[in-house]
Amino acid sequence: MPELARALEGVPVLGPVIRIADLRTYGFRWGDTALSGELPVLEDASPTPAAGGTAGSGAEAMNEAADEYIAQVRETFLWYAAREYQGYVASDTGYQVLRDDDAILSLCFYTTLNAGGSVDYSRYFTLDKATGELLALSDLFLEGSDYVGAVSADILRQMEEQVAAGEGDYFIPGGIWSEEECFRAIDPDQQFYLDENGGLVIVFGEYEVAPGSMGMPRFVIDEEAISDIRAR
């Protein structure tokens, strides 16, 4: 489907970012197949390096990460569209501002793909405005600390409490799930964001730690579980 691929070359991607300045929408339709989305127009509002930071480093990193996400959306969309999956494919991308203050910008880019069924996926970005640094999960903790173990233990505790209260269903030991399916630990680079209260929120994809009925589970980590190893 070369015409479809050529048309998608005009879909806008995100430029250097520090602050959301405007909104930009895009759309494309090919018969019963449609790609649409709304992206933030972002600008680097701090061209002068902050103390200990480098000018534009966070903006450039955010730009590259966002470009990779949009490329993934396009690639997945084209894969289904080229196969005329049940005659209809639709991909819709949007974003959510999770936190935007003087210290932190946290964004979520999300996509819903409909192709005989609905699949949701997303990616999270957290930018330290003071340093211009795009944060990884490990950046939040003291070097050499077992943050994976501490965070994983608190998530497992929350999962067990929700299951016991009939408020959730997760792949945890002691239930109907096999050992291979059960949650043991987060990835060192697990998706996360920092909420408006400074809390660490860990996010999982669909079916990663729970049945599809649970969507994309989020867990706010108890500060007491990580206070002795948290660096920022």
Please report, for each region that a protein language model flagged, where it lies by residue.
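Compositionally biased intrinsically disordered regions enriched in Thr/Gly
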Residues: M1-R232
